[in-house]
Amino acid sequence: MLSKIELMLLRSLETGKTYTPEEAAELSGLSKDAVLKAAYMLQERGYVRVIENVRTHYSLTEEGERYLKEGLPEEKLYSLVKSGVNSMDELRKRMGREFQIALGWLRRKGAVEVEGDKVVPKREPSFDERAALQAIKEGRGVDEGTLKTLMKRKLVTKSETKQVYIEVMKKPEIELEDIITDLTPEMLLEGTWRGKQFLKYDITIPAKEIYGGKIHPYERIIEECRKVFLEMGFTEIKGHYVQPAFWNFDALFQPQDHPARDMQDTFYLDRYIDLEGEIVERVKATHENGWITGSTGWGGEWSLEKARQLVLRTHTTAITIHYLAENPEPPQKAFCIDRVYRRETIDATHLPEFDQLEGVVLDRDVGFKHLLGLLKEFFTKMGFEDVRFRPGYFPYTEPSVEPEVYVEGLGWVELGGAGVFRKEVTEPLGIRGKVLAWGLGIGRLAMLKIGLKDLRRLYLPDLGWLRSMPVARK
C-alpha cells in the first residue's frame, strides 16, 4: 500500500531512468524533501533505487594560496643559502617565523646541512609541492603521498559533497490509497480519526535541517551566573572600562611596584585624571606608613602621578570597590559581570580581554566561613557537585582562597580567587564592616560547562559548532 507522495512520485517518473531530487521535484510537483522521503520509502519496497555519490574535492587554504603565489618557504631559504647567505641569524632575520619550517623541509630533502651557525647547501632539491598546489588549484589530480604531505602542512583542505540520484526500477499496478498524512485538531475533537489509516513515518530518512535562532552558549552561561546571584539577593552593578590606576590598584592596597602593574601586564593610556580629596590622602598614608590601620604599609613614597594614570581595568574589583566607597554602610550585596583587559599572550587558555564575575558582601557579622558557603552555593547551582578551597594570596584580601571544582577527566580545576578585604582596603575608604570578595573567570567556567579545550572557540564565528550546541544543557 503506497502513500500519496509515493504514488505521485512514481507516476511522474519513467521506469529505467535516473533523476536528481530537483528534477523529480519539478516533474512531480512535490518539494525536494518530500521527493527524498518518498524515494527512500519506495526503495524499501523495491520500486526505486537511491544512489548516493560522494565526491571529494581538494582546495588550497589561504596559506596554500600564498605559497603558490610567493613560493614555498623552503624555496626561499634555499635560494638565499645558494646565493651565499649562510648565517643562521641573518636567515632568521630575513625569513622570520618561516625559517624553522623551511629549514626542516630542506633537511628532510637532504638539500642542506647545519654546520655550526651556518646553513650549507648540499644538493639541488626538487620542489614538487608547488607544482602540486598549482595542479590542485586547476582541478587536476596529484599523487596520494604529495596530497597527504600538503594536507599535513595545512596547505590543502578536503571537502566532500553528496549527490543523490533516484533510479526507477519498476512500477506496480496501484491505486491511490486513502492514507491520511496529517492528524488535525478537528479530527481529534470529532473522533473521525478512528478507523482511519495514517501514513507511517520513517524517522531515519534524511531531511533538510532547520537551524532556528538561539542564544549563544557563552551568553547563556553568563545569564545563568547573573540569575544565580540575583536569586541570592544581590544587586548588579556596572562601571567604566577605563579606570584610574587609583581604583584599579591603589585603593586595593596593591603596591605601586607590584608586578601586575607593569607595562607588560596592563594596558596603560597616555591620559591622566585629577585625584583629590580625603580618600586619596588616606590611601596615600596607608601605602606609606599604614595610616591608622595598624599596618606598617608598603613604605617608600606613594606617587600620585602613578595613581592618576588611566588604564583599561584589569579586574572588575575596580568597580566593586568604588561601589563600596560610595555605599560604605552595611548591609550591601553586589556583583558585576563585565569585560576586563590584560596584556596576555593569546593561547588556548588566555586572552587579552575576557569576562569576569566579581562580587562583594558588606556586613558587620560576616566572616570567612560565610564566604566559603556562599561560593559553594554558587558553584552547586551552576552544576558543580564537588567544590573545595585552597589557600591563596592576594594583596588586598586576608585570608585568601582559590575555589576549585572537580571535573571528570580533568580533576580539580581552579576558577578564581576570593577572600576578606584587609583593613588597609576598607578603613581608608570609610567602609564600615567586613567585606567578603571574590573574582571568577567566566570563560574558564564556560569551557568546563560546554566541554571546550580552547577558550578562543567561544569567540569564533563557527556556525557549524554553534548550530550543534543544544538549546538546553544538563
UniProtKB/Swiss-Prot annotation:
UniProt cofactor(s): Mg(2+)
Superkingdom of the source species: Archaea
Species, as recorded: Archaeoglobus fulgidus (strain ATCC 49558 / DSM 4304 / JCM 9628 / NBRC 100126 / VC-16)
Known EC number: 6.1.1.20
Name under which the protein is recorded: Phenylalanine--tRNA ligase alpha subunit
Gene from which the chain derives: pheS
Alphabetical keyword list: Aminoacyl-tRNA synthetase, ATP-binding, Cytoplasm, Ligase, Magnesium, Metal-binding, Nucleotide-binding, Protein biosynthesis
Family recorded in the similarity comment: Belongs to the class-II aminoacyl-tRNA synthetase family. Phe-tRNA synthetase alpha subunit type 2 subfamily.
PROSITE patterns listed in its UniProt record: AA_TRNA_LIGASE_II
Substrates-to-products reaction catalysed: tRNA(Phe) + L-phenylalanine + ATP = L-phenylalanyl-tRNA(Phe) + AMP + diphosphate + H(+)
GO process terms (BP): phenylalanyl-tRNA aminoacylation
GO molecular function: ATP binding; magnesium ion binding; phenylalanine-tRNA ligase activity; tRNA binding
Residues at which Mg(2+) binds: 398
Compartments it resides in: Cytoplasm
EC top class named in words: ligase
